[in-house]
């Protein structure tokens, strides 16, 4: 049995050999930025790079309308505006997600109603059905870590049955599919982040897609004014009268960011092909360890692998704590192994229990802390994650991560502990 690095043995690799570097800036990336610099660095409508990217992104998803914004959070904010969310409206949402899936709704005085997770960390359809009331106006979902929600079609059908909106946060899931249908096409409106670590990135940015012109018009007026609303909202629409001012905000993207995103987007299918090959390779290598539960890979899904989430089951690892397991992997040079901190359960966050302190104009009183999320609690308690590398020339890094995991896991099995 090879001595573990945490006990003074030789590491699998040096730390600087095991980083996840993203995005990869190429000569093509530099070229499109420089070209855009000499065209314009501010766009007031959907001309130029804005129109080009919006059309490509909409066509890729077979959607009619696309709208760029300055961040994924702003894009989600615009979805809530699009559905005319109001004070005391209830929105069903995942208790386990990044907070910005839910936090923008607090600017409308709405009430988030948290739903439990399924065994993949995505929102549970059973929980959705149980939490629905006559006050429910919408459901917002997240395809966590780039894994499509297994019951997304059931959720979409439920929304149609109840005549409520379905909003999709696809910020982790660019290009992901389930049953031959891309995420972001199941609901009434969907949002993607183009932030620096996202699969399609411009550094910062966001985009929404919809087939509903009324939803598009409201979102457009929220974050844009003058030229773009004037040219894209029909004069017969009551909203047209507000084109000059919009709703008072400016959430426009930056052309340089969208130039980068447009160049990156051209490689998305290649990115996903390589990521899925690496994810399958990692999964096959780790399946034999009873204390590791790998994410489900099925023939009817294409995951985008924003991250690869593993569940570490301490009681099956002879009581070795998750933190100690991760420390042993870090010691081998596997520096990207992570226990997520910024993404977790939302129900106890102060914004959702004591909004009265900072948003007293909308929430005069505290909100009761919602409880009863056993699946999500277990998922978060057991979760560790690694990135999935994206390029064929990174296969050696993937192999070293597999070797590091196997080294530590084999030690635990043979020695019944660590």
List PLM regions with ranges:
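Conserved PLP-binding active-site segment in aminotransferase class I/II-type PLP enzymes
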Residues: 1-82, 86, 155, 160, ...
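Conserved PLP-binding active-site segment of the aspartate aminotransferase-like
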Residues: 296-299, 305-317, 336-355, 382-395
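Conserved PLP-anchoring active-site segment centered on the Schiff-base-forming lysine
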Residues: 77-133, 138-140, 329
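Generic structural signal for small/hydrophobic residues in well-ordered secondary structure
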Residues: 33-34, 57, 75, 91, ...
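Basic phosphate/pyrophosphate-binding loop/patch that engages nucleotide-derived ligands
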Residues: 157-165, 207-226, 319-320, 324-334
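Conserved PLP cofactor-binding pocket of PLP-dependent enzymes
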Residues: 227-238, 286, 325-384, 415-418
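Active-site phosphate-binding strand-loop segment of PLP-dependent enzymes
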Residues: 120-202, 207-214
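Active-site region of PLP-dependent enzymes
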Residues: 173-179, 186-307
């Amino acid at each position: 049995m090879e001595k573990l690095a945490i006990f003074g043995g030789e590491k699998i690799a040096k730390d600087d050999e095991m980083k996840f570097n993203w995005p990869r800036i190429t000569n093509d990336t530099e070229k499109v930025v420089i070209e855009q610099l000499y065209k314009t660095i501010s766009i007031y409508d959907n001309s130029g790079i804005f129109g080009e990217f919006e059309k490509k992104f909409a066509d890729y998803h077979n959607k009619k309308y696309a709208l760029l914004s300055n961040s994924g959070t702003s894009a989600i904010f615009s979805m809530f505006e699009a559905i005319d969310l109001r004070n005391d409206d209830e929105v069903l949402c995942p208790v386990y997600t990044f907070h910005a899936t839910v936090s923008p709704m607090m600017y409308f005085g709405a009430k988030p109603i948290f739903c439990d997770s399924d065994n993949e960390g995505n929102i549970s359809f059973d929980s959705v059905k149980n939490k629905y009331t006559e006050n429910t106006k919408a459901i917002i979902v997240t395809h966590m870590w780039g894994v499509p929600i297994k019951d997304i079609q059931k959720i979409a059908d439920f929304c149609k049955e109840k005549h409520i909106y379905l909003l999709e946060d696809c910020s982790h899931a660019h290009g992901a599919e389930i049953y031959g249908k891309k995420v972001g096409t199941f609901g009434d409106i969907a949002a993607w982040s183009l932030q620096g670590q996202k699969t399609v990135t411009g550094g910062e940015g966001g985009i929404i897609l919809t087939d509903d012109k009324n939803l598009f018009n409201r979102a457009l007026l929220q974050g844009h004014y003058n030229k773009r609303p004037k040219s894209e909202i029909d004069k017969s629409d009551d909203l047209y009268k507000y084109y000059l001012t919009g709703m008072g905000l400016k959430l426009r993207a930056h052309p340089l960011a969208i130039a980068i995103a447009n160049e990156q987007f051209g490689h998305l299918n290649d990115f996903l092909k390589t990521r899925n090959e690496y994810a399958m390779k990692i999964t096959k290598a780790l399946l034999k360890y009873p204390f590791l539960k790998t994410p489900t890979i099925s023939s009817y899904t294409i995951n985008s692998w924003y991250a690869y989430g593993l569940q570490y089951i301490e009681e099956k690892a002879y009581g070795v704590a998750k933190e100690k397991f991760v420390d042993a992997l870090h010691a081998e040079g596997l520096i990207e192994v992570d226990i997520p901190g910024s993404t977790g359960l939302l129900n106890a966050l102060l914004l959702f229990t004591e909004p009265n302190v900072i948003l007293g104009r909308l929430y005069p009183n505290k909100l009761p802390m919602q409880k009863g999320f056993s699946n999500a609690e277990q998922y978060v308690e057991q979760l560790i994650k690694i990135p999935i590398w994206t390029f064929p020339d990174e296969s050696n890094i993937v192999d070293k991560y597999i070797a590091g995991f196997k080294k530590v896991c084999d030690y635990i099995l043979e020695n019944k502990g660590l």
